[in-house]
Structure formats: structure tokens, C-alpha cells
Design a protein with these regions (language model features):
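Amphipathic alpha-helical dimerization/coiled-coil segments
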Residues: 1-2, 8, 70-101
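N-terminal helix-turn-helix DNA-binding core of bacterial DNA-binding proteins
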Residues: 2-41, 61-73
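A short linear hydrophobic-aromatic micro-motif
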Residues: 18, 53-56
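Alpha-helical residues within the helix-turn-helix
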Residues: 34, 45, 51-52
Length: 101
């Protein structure tokens, strides 16, 4: 996983919507496409970007391709971002955090 690929994948609202759709469980590509008013090639491109970033995985089931959320990459990114907020053992600039004097 390249971090920049994950951020690029997450930067698009349509791809974030796909991830939200997959929160409830695996879906066939057709069911994902039915939630959008954009072309099938555009949906396919979005699914490819998400797959290449490691955010979703897919498997073929007969004629269907089933997509599933892959949370491990998301957890890695969230952990990395959370670490960036820590300065001197506490959350920097957190409004509820008392500052040391």
C-alpha cells in the first residue's frame, strides 16, 4: 500500500460513497453501480482505484464480481494520522487538554 494512493482514493466523494456502501457487507459491482447516476466505466475506474489502494478487495462469483471493504489499510491510515496529533505525550491543540505551563 502506498499512502499517497490511499489519500488519492479517499479524496473523491464517489469513492467515499462506495466505501460507505460496503460498510454493511460485500456487494456485487452492479449493486454498487445502481447507487450512482454515473456511467459503468466511471464506476469501474473508481472500484479499480479503491482496489489498487488496498481499500477494497474483490472476488469473482460466476458472472458477478463481489466487492468487500478491506479495513486494515483504513486502520493503518487512522493510526498514522492519530500519531501526528500527539506532541509531548498528549494531543496537541485539543480544546479539552490542559496545557502544561
Amino acid at each position: 500500500m502506498a499512502v499517497q494512493d490511499v489519500y488519492r482514493a479517499l479524496s473523491d466523494p464517489a469513492r467515499r460513497k462506495i466505501l460507505k456502501l460496503l460498510q454493511d457487507g460485500p456487494l456485487p459491482a452492479g449493486a454498487i453501480a445502481a447507487e450512482f447516476s454515473i456511467s459503468w466505466p466511471s464506476i469501474s475506474r473508481h472500484l479499480g482505484v479503491l482496489t489498487n489502494a488496498g481499500l477494497v478487495r474483490h472476488e469473482r462469483n460466476g458472472q458477478q464480481v463481489i466487492y468487500q471493504l478491506s479495513t486494515s489499510v483504513l486502520l493503518d491510515i487512522v493510526t498514522e494520522l492519530a500519531e501526528l496529533t500527539r506532541v509531548g505525550g498528549h494531543n496537541a491543540d485539543h480544546p479539552n487538554q490542559e496545557r502544561k505551563k
